Amino acid sequence: MKIAALLSGGKDSLYASYIAMQYGWEITHAVTIKPEKLSWMYHTENIDFVEPIAESMGIPLIERHTVAEKEDELEDLKIALEGMDIDGVISGAIASEYQRTRIEKICHELGIKSFTPLWHKNGELLLREMVGAGFEIAIVAVAAEGLGEEWLGRIIDSKCIDELSRLNKKYRVNISGEGGEYETFVLDCPLYAKKLIVEKAEKEWERGRGTLGIKKVRMEDK
């Protein structure tokens, strides 16, 4: 099975790709859509650093910009996938019907399959599976009650997951970040030949939300 992986650099898209690898599927391409503004379909945090991720995975990266208008961003994904010798596309959709159904629509038009192995999985269980599989996941954006500036740059581990679980009970924070509570960037995982080291990053904080903007990374042997 040959598939293209829709990658944002975040935990869900890369863990979905890891599951594909466990199935024995061949990931032939990474595909990244870069929105020019806030998008319902695509992530924007540190999207420029998918390139070293694809390099570490040893696969070519297909990038396409989009103005992030509802129908245009679908057409841009279709254009990015056209002509690929693949059987399907894998994505990290967990709960967004908007995202999942639109990817399925594009795949149907292209005559390929859409795979969403994380769909409706328990968020806490997924995080623990990721950590157990060797994923090093940094939190790079927060926007929720209980998630202060100190969370920016934090690596998700068992203690972090326990805290997210408590915040879920107290403030209804989605443990997976599916409501936009937080965004992530994967520094290392079994898909990488080399891990990523952040050499320069800048924090921004305003009115209860913030980002960790990555400015420079380097690859390091494991």
Ranges and model annotations:
Residues M1-K222:
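Nucleotide-activated chemistry modules centered on ATP-dependent adenylation/adenylyltransferase
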